[in-house]
């Protein structure tokens, strides 16, 4: 049987999360393939995944390529007409339910129009009563480079059960047509971590495609298990990559200048003061490092 769908996820020192995800997927379905890209994890995790899940295709990277680089490795070996990128810290709620049916709803959305190139499921958090994390995005502000995830933090009463276009995909779970990737290009690797899915969304849109939110499929997200909510790594890349995103995507010089001014002179200063007050000089240092590296290292 031909491979219709390639599910791609990245493992980086997250064996338990990756195994939880594998256990929630219909691995016995021969019309799909599951690809795990191991980004140079410690403790030989790639081999452990291969031994536990022989039906899964495991790619060993000899270095950490980041989110985009790891997924691009997966793209290069994927056989499916559709590629489903999901974080390893996500799970489908209950394998006894029709997980493949939910996944197929994303494929059906992509097949409903030649213009749709990318689709995301409803994303809910795994904690408490599983509040909504994502039901689409609002547009990014040209100046602040911020937007809102629709429904984030709300209890799910079915109020976001209608499919609709969204300007950006959520990196935790996004399915893409292969032809859209061939036209738009693979994920931008200059970001390494954070903002690459927003940049890629714009690349997909510039190639002539639209992006949709499809709530007939729901995935549950543990959120930032790989980097931590308040880690210097996360702070550094968020600081640097907001500026990099502006450089790559700002529509004009005026907007770019105003964004730089806002992000460096207001956001970075405020964040640094906040971190120092809360006795987190490591995070304040990460902010400064992110700005310094953005200014002193050109990236396309």
Summary of predicted features, one role per range:
Residues 60-78, 88-96:
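Glycine-rich, basic loop-to-helix element that forms the pyrophosphate-binding segment
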Residues 83:
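Short aromatic/hydrophobic "clamp" motif used to bind/position activated sugar donors
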Residues 233-241, 252-300:
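Non-catalytic, C-terminal membrane-associated alpha-helical segments of glycosyltransferases
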